[in-house]
Amino acid sequence: MPSRTPAAPAAARKSPAVARTKADSKPARRGLAVGDPAPAFDLPGDDGQRHSLAGLQGRRFVLYFYPRDSTPGCTTEACDFRDREPALKKAGVPVLGVSGDDLKSHAKFRGKYQLGFPLLSDPDHAVAGAYGAFGEKMMYGRALQGIIRSTFLIGPDGRVEAVWSPVKVAGHAEAVLQAVREAAAGKATSA
């Protein structure tokens, strides 16, 4: 069981963009933390585009990892992000969902629930692993390897601004939106 960190790392305390609460935010497994450079990625999306860290340079964005399309928790999480997407877009912050499902499954899932953001395919879990979002987890009392529901707010400088891992779905998208608002306010006041 991962330990909870009572205070954000020193780099995080300098920025109002950090969203840390005992209930929702814990350090990611394998050490990815606030202030760390985000691992590079380049993945295909169900929108026919490739999405990469380099292509998003200079923009703040949400990257969330979820276990599987069309499952109850993943559907709730995706729909919660969908419902907050207008506010996120207003803040200039795109959302990208990532799982190991193929593009056909993603397109079906996105269409069925009218998700306005792309879903990226990471079939070998290499990107999830780089973010600490793949590893051993418990499901129905059994240990297994899989995607650990995790979300990262990546700043315009390519550094991690906030981490939620493992995610509790209820209230999560709202917590992410609040972190985005705080980050935007911090950016506006420091300019």
Where are these regions (language model features)?
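Chalcogenol-based redox active-site neighborhoods
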Residues: 1-191
